[in-house]
Structure formats: C-alpha cells, structure tokens
Curated annotation (Swiss-Prot):
Origin species: Nostoc sp. (strain PCC 7120 / SAG 25.82 / UTEX 2576)
InterPro entries noted in UniProt: AcsF, Ferritin-like_SF, Rr_diiron-bd_dom
EC number: 1.14.13.81
UniProt similarity note: Belongs to the AcsF family.
Entry function: Catalyzes the formation of the isocyclic ring in chlorophyll biosynthesis. Mediates the cyclase reaction, which results in the formation of divinylprotochlorophyllide (Pchlide) characteristic of all chlorophylls from magnesium-protoporphyrin IX 13-monomethyl ester (MgPMME).
Superkingdom of origin organism: Bacteria
Name under which the protein is recorded: Magnesium-protoporphyrin IX monomethyl ester [oxidative] cyclase 1
EC class: oxidoreductase
NCBIfam families on file: AcsF, PRK13654.1
Any one biological process term the GO annotation gives: light-independent chlorophyll biosynthetic process
Known cofactor(s): Fe cation
Catalytic activity annotation: Mg-protoporphyrin IX 13-monomethyl ester + 3 NADPH + 3 O2 + 2 H(+) = 3,8-divinyl protochlorophyllide a + 3 NADP(+) + 5 H2O
Record key words, sorted: Chlorophyll biosynthesis, Iron, Metal-binding, NADP, Oxidoreductase, Photosynthesis
Length: 351
C-alpha cells in the first residue's frame, strides 16, 4: 500500500481557486518567431544588466533569522504562512514558465532564451528564499510535487507578454510600498524577510522592463483597437484579483500596520501609472466609481468565502453564491466600461 499522506512539515498547497497564483504554458513556436528588432538595443542593454546579477549576494539569510518564531501565533501566524505560500507559488510559477521558454527557444532565439534563463534564475532564488522562510514555521512546500500536480493554463504568447509584465510591475509596487512603510514603522517589522524587499523589488522591476521591451517590439500589441481592448481587460483582471485578494487577507496587512484598502489603492494606482508607459491605454483610476466598484466586488467575494466555509450542502452553497458571482461580474463590467486614458496620444503630445 502506497502512503499518500504528506511528509511531516511538508505543507499541502492551498486549494486552487480563481484567485490563487496559476501555472502557465504557452505557444513556444510563436515565441521563437517574435521579431525583436524594434527593441534590439534596449534588450541587449537589459541582457547585460541581467548577466551582471546585482542581487547574487542579496538572498543570504543572516543571524536575524536564527531564532524561534513561536511568538508569532494564532491568526497572525496563519495569515503570514498563507502570504509566504502564495508568494512562493507565484515566484515558482514564473520560474517554470521562464525555464521552459529558455529551453524551447535556445536554438531558435538565443538572446530571448538567455533572457528567460536569467529571469528563471531570479525567480528560483525568490521561491527558494520564501520556502526557507516557511521552514522557520516548521513547514515547507514540496515544489517538485507541486510541479507535477498543479493545473497548467495555456496562454498565447501575446497574453503572456501582457500578464507577466503586469505581474512583475505590480510585484514591484507591492514590495516597495511594504518596504517603505516598514522603514517608517520598524515596530511592525515582525520578521526579517521584509528587510530584503528593497533589492528584491528591483528584480521585479527589471523583469517588468524586459517584458515592456518585448511588448513594444510587437506593434500589433499596442497600435490598434484590439490591443486597447485587451490592455483594458488585463489591467482590470490583475487589479480586480489584487483587490479581492488583499481584502481576503486584510489580517496580514493589519499585522504590518497597513490598512488593506489603502494599500490596495496605492498599489493599483502606481501599477496603472507604470503600465501606461507600455500599454496603449491605462485605466482611469481617478474616476469616482472606479475604486468603489472594485471594493464592492471585494465585499461580495468575502460573502462568498463565508458561504464556502459554512456546513451547508454544496447545492445550497451554489444557489447562495450565484447572485454574488453575478454581482461581481456586473460590477467589473461597469469598471471596464469606464473610459480609459489613451497613453499613445499622451506620448505623441510629449513628443
């Protein structure tokens, strides 16, 4: 008889939901045929920067980690472990995608292959550092098993460029906002990993800049009406996911001395502004209905989670959740229909 129980200290990954980090695969043939000539100089400069590996000595645990963490307990402990797990899975997802792209493109597009190899190096470093942090709480993720058991979602390479760009840039803003907040309020820095966020976020920023160059090298991804619609869709998808997730885990942000709603506003506003440098449009986050609609969705999502935790039969849960799901979809549609800001027109004005 085969023992299928997890080993002691090995954490069973959280159940996959719409909001959990996903694993992706893509069309490697299309990726190999991307014409990068329009951004060749920028990409070569970024490749040289990636080879320099400025953070190669950064992810080293120091003596601050060498202590008992039993004083972090109860809901705060659980919330922090969930944060570490989500972050680890997200970084590991990036590692797997970049590693596979590097392997598949090695003989077809060597510059792009090396770029993905170096980004995979960074993501693996991040995931390993986060998993070691989980070890301080007597848990860890079996990433080899996660690789085999996780569901993989296929995205065309064009979608990968949009979504990974946004993922890296929103990651940058999340890390730097937390770091700056804890610089001002060191009494809330309850674990040493947060001290690493300033240099850590620079990896995210560099990766985002690479994807910006890749995106701008493909005019069809920014110079037509379809690209504008897709840009709005992916911006809204990423921001809605962030808003719902942050409010789901408001306890973690409270433990850092952050208000979840205020943190979400800062991250979304800054990421949107940054995305305007790459995308043909950015969302109008200053519209009076923009954040209230997103926050309403977050409230509905909390109601759904409460229903899911109840002991009612699955059918009853589904009936109760359906109107809430419909309300989320409707409110997100209202956000999508808010007139966006034409960033290409702004670029022309600056010129």
């Amino acid at each position: 008889m085969v023992n299928t129980l997890p080993k002691p200290g090995i954490k069973t990954p959280s159940k996959e939901t719409v909001l959990t980090p996903r694993f992706y695969t893509t069309d490697f043939e299309t990726a190999a045929n991307l014409d990068l000539s329009a951004q060749e100089n920028e990409l070569q400069a970024m490749l040289a920067e990636m080879r320099a590996d400025y953070n190669r000595h950064h992810f080293v645990r120091d003596e601050a980690f060498e202590q008992s963490w039993e004083h972090i307990d109860g809901e705060a402990r659980q919330a922090f472990i969930e944060y570490l797990e989500r972050s680890c899975i997200s970084e590991f997802s990036g590692f797997l995608l970049f590693k596979e792209l590097s392997r598949k493109l090695k003989n077809r597009s060597p510059v792009l292959a090396e770029m993905f190899q170096l980004m995979a190096r960074d993501e693996a470093r991040h995931a390993g550092f986060l998993n070691k942090a989980m070890g301080d709480f007597k848990l860890s993720l079996d990433l080899a098993t996660v690789t085999k058991t996780r569901t993989y979602t296929f995205f065309p390479i064009e979608w990968v460029l949009y979504t990974v760009y946004l993922s890296e840039k929103i990651g940058y803003w999340r890390y730097i906002i937390i770091f700056r907040h804890l610089e001002k309020h060191p009494e809330n820095q309850f674990y040493p990993i947060f001290r690493y966020f300033e240099s850590w976020c620079q990896d995210e920023n560099r990766h985002g800049d690479i994807f910006k160059a890749l995106l701008r090298s493909q005019p069809q991804l920014w110079n037509n009406w379809k690209a504008r619609l897709w840009s709005r869709f992916f911006l809204l998808s990423v921001f809605a996911t962030h808003t719902l997730t942050v409010h789901e885990r408001s306890g973690f942000y409270k433990s850092l001395g952050l208000d979840a709603t205020d943190f979400d506003l800062q991250v979304v506003r800054n990421t949107n502004e940054t995305a305007g440098r790459a995308f043909p449009v950015m969302l109008n986050t200053e519209h009076p209905k923009f954040f209230p609609l997103l926050q309403r969705c977050a409230g509905y999502n909390l109601n759904i989670s409460e229903i899911e935790r109840s002991s009612q039969p699955k059918f009853v849960k589904l009936i109760r959740k359906l109107p809430l799901i419909a309300a989320i979809v409707w409110n997100l549609l209202m956000v999508y229909l808010i007139k966006p800001i034409d960033t290409e027109a702004l670029r022309e004005t600056v010129r």
